[in-house]
Design a protein with these regions (language model features):
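Helix-loop-helix hairpin linking two adjacent transmembrane segments in secondary transporters
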Residues: 21-31, 204-264
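C-terminal membrane-cytosol helix-exit motif in multi-pass small-molecule transporters
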Residues: 39-48, 246-274, 497-501
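Extracytoplasmic gate region of multi-pass secondary transporters
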Residues: 79-87, 299-371, 427, 459-466
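Cytoplasmic helix-loop-helix junction between adjacent transmembrane helices
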Residues: 169-206
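C-terminal transmembrane helical hairpin of 12-TM major facilitator-type secondary transporters
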Residues: 380-430
């Protein structure tokens, strides 16, 4: 009865949001949705207490991870905004697909390599300080990108005048962004027992998915709301795709200062044994960074997770990024009031029209599926859920190769949703949850940095490679067919290594 009472506000919000979607504007729907998501995960968090924490502890923990999670969501808003902006840049000749692939690819490599320094730094300084570095640095970088965009567009600049400044400052943005993931893992490793992390991984994956939604749909809404018309043609103020995230990031940087605590003891509660591979109970590494890296890179399970997550990086952004460009490139003819009109499937297909929403739902679904079966059916082992999700991706990309070739747009849209669900679920389980399990409180950030670093090395590899492969694809489905075909081998590699870590579980090594 108590759980039913708790669920009533959530149910009412979902009903309200459904009513808004069916009867009012898409922009109002976008504005309300983040509050619905927060309500849902608050309710789910209230149901999950397998180790019997006190009510006071759980309330303080809630505010700690909620602000931390929303800070990370805002980082996503300032990371994938380039994808939204690049589609508009491409339409006006300021950024080709190859240029976008190069900028994002190099930025992703910077993100991945930065973990070599930023992982141990987060373990040493604590996640609170490094999430503040992330939000402030990314805010300033996005503000500069917005100014560059404004200057080039207002002064009639060309693609070359945009490319090099963007390459430099987007890479700087990605350096600061790389503090985000390690900060999350470092803080939450001290606040959550290993038995809580599977379901919590789903909750936190939801917050990450909210960030993807903000990046694609909220940034897209902002561009639509700020556009003007010149000679009857829409003129998009693309700089707001960078200024808006900068403002949001500064707000969360301020909240981080006052709300986040690295450990329960800093908030007036006792620290506790989290049941993971923590070596030193105070959570501070006693080894040099080189010694930690040597230990990590000689651990067979971590090495296999690195291989899996490299593939996840190829696949995740292989869908999220190129799905947008595919949708803008493919054209269909619609008949509206008896008049034929050629439109892109980005404006005609449900899945591509609501790309951010679809990716968010995919992330929520994949995260909770992976976390639930991991904790409830496999004793908090992360390998089995990752295996099932990789198998889903293998089947999905094989079918997608046919769907792209034969222009089955609805099937391509659905499969993009399904495979995003799978890959985000894997990413949450391994980079977000297993890194805490195998790193422990003292080395969690370094392990997360290594694993997530390879995610973005995979991202960089596919971004540059697919950018070159698809540069001249235009609206030719036979050329776009190389998109899913390129990604299929990485599902096979990931499937093999997820099977290899099926029984992996951390050994507790706590020392006082």
């Amino acid at each position: 009865m108590n759980n039913l009472f708790k669920s009533l506000p959530v149910v009412l919000l979902i009903v309200l949001e459904t009513f808004v979607y069916l009867n009012y504007s898409h922009d109002l729907f976008v504005g309300i949705l983040p509050f619905v998501v927060i309500a849902v995960i608050t309710y789910l968090y209230s149901l999950n207490n397998p180790v019997g924490h006190s009510k006071a502890f759980r309330i303080r923990s809630y505010f700690n991870w909620m602000i931390l999670g929303l800070s990370y969501a805002s980082l996503y808003m300032g990371r994938y905004n380039l994808t939204v902006a690049s589609a508009k840049f491409d339409e006006i000749g300021l950024m080709s697909k190859e240029a976008f692939g190069t900028i994002f690819g190099i930025g992703a490599v910077v993100y991945g390599v930065s973990f070599v320094v930023n992982g141990p730094l987060a373990d040493k300084l604590g996640g609170k300080k490094t999430i503040i570095i992330a939000t402030v640095g990314a805010a300033l970088s996005n503000a500069v990108l917005g100014y560059i965009t404004y200057s080039v567009m207002k002064n009639g600049g060309n693609a070359d005048s945009l490319f090099w400044p963007f390459l430099v400052f987007y890479s700087l943005n990605m350096y600061f962004q790389s503090f985000g993931a390690v900060s999350i893992v470092k803080v939450n490793a001290a606040w959550f027992h290993i038995k809580e992390r599977g379901i919590f991984g789903g909750i936190f994956g939801t917050l990450i998915s909210l960030g993807i939604f903000l990046a694609f749909d909220l940034n897209g809404m902002i561009l639509n709301e700020t556009k003007t018309y010149v000679n009857g043609q829409p003129y998009y103020h693309i700089w707001w795709a960078f200024f808006a995230p900068a403002i949001v990031l500064i707000i969360f940087a301020i909240l981080d200062i006052f709300v986040i605590k690295d450990r329960p003891s800093q908030a007036g509660f006792e620290d506790f044994d989290t049941g993971d591979a923590t070596r030193y109970e105070d959570g501070a590494p006693k080894e040099s960074a080189i010694a930690i890296y040597k230990r990590i890179l000689s651990h067979p399970v971590i090495l296999m997770m690195i291989a899996i997550e490299f593939c996840s990086g190829v696949l995740r952004n292989g869908i999220m990024h190129w799905g947008v460009h595919y949708a803008h490139s493919m054209k269909i003819t619609e008949v509206v009031n008896g008049v034929k009109k050629v439109v892109s499937i980005a404006d005609a297909d449900f899945f591509f029209q609501n790309w951010g929403l679809i990716l968010m739902i995919a992330g929520i679904t994949g995260g909770f599926f992976a976390g639930f079966i991991s904790d409830k059916f496999f004793g908090s082992r992360r390998g089995p859920s990752a295996f099932f999700l990789y198998f889903g991706m293998f089947v999905g990309f094989v079918v997608m190769a046919f769907a792209v070739r034969y222009q089955w747009y609805d099937i391509v849209g659905f499969l993009s949703f399904f495979m995003s669900m799978c890959v985000i679920g894997v990413h949450g389980m391994l980079s977000g949850t297993a890194s805490m399990d195998f790193g422990g409180k003292d080395s969690a950030a370094t392990v997360a940095g290594v694993i997530d670093g390879f995610v973005y090395l995979g991202t960089g590899f596919q971004s540059v490679t697919l950018g070159k492969i698809l540069e001249n694809a235009g609206s030719d489905p036979s050329k776009w067919n190389y998109w899913p075909i390129f990604l299929i081998p990485f599902t096979v590699i990931g499937l093999y290594f997820t099977w290899k870590i099926w029984n992996a579980f951390p050994e507790s090594k706590t020392k006082m």
